[in-house]
Every structure is written in structure tokens, then in C-alpha cells.
């Protein structure tokens, strides 16, 4: 089951898969307007932010990026225990699924289009939704 979350900015919808099977479903059925978040180097939920049509990754307010990043960190078994976690994010259209990849595993069409941020401390109000 995919989980939907209300974003602090009403223009956006956040949704998430909690395991590799849900993540695989989201990879297969994403929209071009989706921004994908994941903990770098650790297993985690795939968090998606649905952008309004015509908006790009550069238009997303930093507060919204941090909100999605907190949700991503909170839903990583390893990442939620770490003080500093690197969160990577890119547009769904940049995700590449190659034959032989495990469920939930992705690559990128253009690694330069992958952005990152660091979550230093967990925000329980955001993470415990």
C-alpha cells in the first residue's frame, strides 16, 4: 500500500513506498512531475513529491525539500539512526531501471541531474507521520 502525506505547502503531495515491492511499483508508475528522494548508500523508502505541472526541481522551496528529506530519513532502518544522512533526489524521469536490478533498485540516466542534501538531525514532527 502506498502512503500519502500532506505537505506543509498545499501545492504539493508527498507519497511513499515502505518496502522494495511498493518502491518497485512506484518506479514503474511514476509521473514526469514526480521528484524522487532516497537515502544515499542505505536502504530506505522511496519518497516522491508530486510537482505542479510546469514546475521544475529548481522551483521547489528548500523547506519542502527538507520535509521530504526528513520523511526519507525517518523511513530508513539504518539512516534513521545516523546523525548526518545524505539524501539524494532527482526527477522520476531520470531514474533508470535496468534488467537484472533488484526490486526497488535504480540507476540514473544522468548522474549530474541528481541533487543532494544532508539531514543532520531528525525532526520527529515530520518523520512520525
What are these regions (language model features)?
Residues 1-31, 61:
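Long beta-strand-rich cores associated with HINT superfamily self-processing modules
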Residues 4-6, 15-17, 38, 48, ...:
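Residues in well-ordered beta-strands of folded domains
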Residues 8-10, 41, 81:
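Short flexible coil/turn linkers enriched for glycine and charged/polar residues
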Residues 22-24, 46, 54-56, 96-98:
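Eukaryotic short linear interaction motifs
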Residues 36-42:
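Short glycine/proline-enriched loop/turn "hinge" motifs that connect secondary-structure elements
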Residues 42-50:
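Glycine-rich, often proline-containing surface loops adjacent to acidic residues and nearby aromatics
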Residues 49-65:
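Short histidine-centered catalytic/ligand-binding loop motif
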Residues 64-129:
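Helix-rich interaction surfaces within compact, conserved domain-sized segments
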Amino acid at each position: 500500500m502506498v502512503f500519502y502525506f500532506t505537505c506543509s505547502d498545499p501545492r504539493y503531495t508527498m507519497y511513499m513506498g515502505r518496502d522494495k515491492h511498493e518502491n518497485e511499483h512506484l518506479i514503474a508508475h511514476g509521473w514526469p512531475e514526480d521528484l524522487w528522494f532516497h537515502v544515499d548508500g542505505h536502504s530506505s523508502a522511496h519518497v516522491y513529491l508530486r510537482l505542479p505541472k510546469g514546475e521544475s526541481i529548481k522551483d521547489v522551496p528548500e523547506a519542502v525539500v527538507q520535509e521530504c528529506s526528513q520523511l526519507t530519513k525517518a523511513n530508513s532502518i539504518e539512516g534513521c539512526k545516523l546523525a548526518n544522512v545524505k539524501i539524494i533526489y532527482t526527477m522520476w524521469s531520470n531514474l533508470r531501471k535496468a534488467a537484472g536490478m533488484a526490486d526497488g533498485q535504480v540507476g540514473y540516466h544522468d548522474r549530474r541531474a541528481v541533487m543532494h542534501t544532508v539531514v543532520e538531525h531528525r525532526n520527529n514532527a515530520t518523520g512520525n507521520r
